[in-house]
Amino acid sequence: MSEHRQALGRYGEELAVKHIRQAGLTVLECNYRCPLGEMDIIAQEGETIIFIEVRTRSTGSRGWGEESITAKKRERLYRIATHYLKFRNYKEWPSLRFDLIAIRCQNQEGKQPDIIWIRGI
């Protein structure tokens, strides 16, 4: 992955964390890594644990972030979430939700990135 894409991804994740906190959620973990992959953000809203994938794009040439979640990717996110819950020794599984936050950074002077939060992917 190019340095530019890595920087764009980090920027998008930072924006997403700010957005999540402003919405009143508690961020439990960022960039949770396990042998199965990585979960960008794990948050909590009330009794619900939310696993959040962040997709940041500067152009739509390869499709926007919200268009890029495949069934295979969702399945991987579910497996990572299962690992997280087992690793954190949850005795009973809490209510779970999987969300996507798509960030569109279109390099228009003075324009803030668009943040699209899709709950329950």
Curated annotation (Swiss-Prot):
In terms of CDD domains, this protein maps to: PoNe_Nuclease
Q: Which GO terms describe its molecular function?
A: nucleic acid binding
Going by the entry's taxonomy, the superkingdom of the source organism is recorded as Bacteria
What the entry lists under Pfam families is as follows: UPF0102
Q: Which NCBIfam families does the UniProt record give? A: PRK12497.1-3, PRK12497.3-3, YraN family protein
Q: Which family does it belong to?
A: Belongs to the UPF0102 family.
From the Swiss-Prot or TrEMBL record, give the protein name.
Answer: UPF0102 protein Dhaf_3740
Query: Which organism does this record belong to?
Result: Desulfitobacterium hafniense (strain DSM 10664 / DCB-2)
